[in-house]
Amino acid sequence: VELGKKLINEKNAKVLLFGGPEEDELKLSISQMIKPEHSFLIKTEKFLQSIAIMKRCNVFVTNDSALMHVASALGLKVIALIGPTNPHYIHPWKTEHKIVSLNLDCAPCFFYSPKPLTCSRTDVQFKCIKELEVDMVWNNIFQKGGFPWIG
């Protein structure tokens, strides 16, 4: 939400909210918390329709998901928010990308298996993703060492 607000307020960006039908309520909630006139809920019947819309994005901010890999395959510039997975194993491939991660000593702790994701931390559960800050993502996009193709 905070990243969306900052992109809209400071860069006049349009924010597209992707996800499956099970995430429609979440996408609507996010859209309402940022500026609805600058955010768009992507609801498609077919995965290929979502991909066609993704191709129009200037940059794709995502977690480690199928859409991250699709964005990479499309040659999009990708900002990947990585928490419990291994960024050396799952990173966007053959495209310009930045990895935003806390690089905690307990990560990676998720190794693609049928077991559900659990967190062994006692201080903050899933700290690796919950404590990623907007400025970390913003700086990877716009500041020194960020992408020269986004202004």
Task: Tell me what each language-model feature is.
Residues 8, 24, 143, 149-150:
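Intrinsically disordered, low-complexity, compositionally biased regions/tails
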Residues 1-83:
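Donor-binding and catalytic core of enzymes assembling or modifying cell-surface/extracellular glycoconjugates
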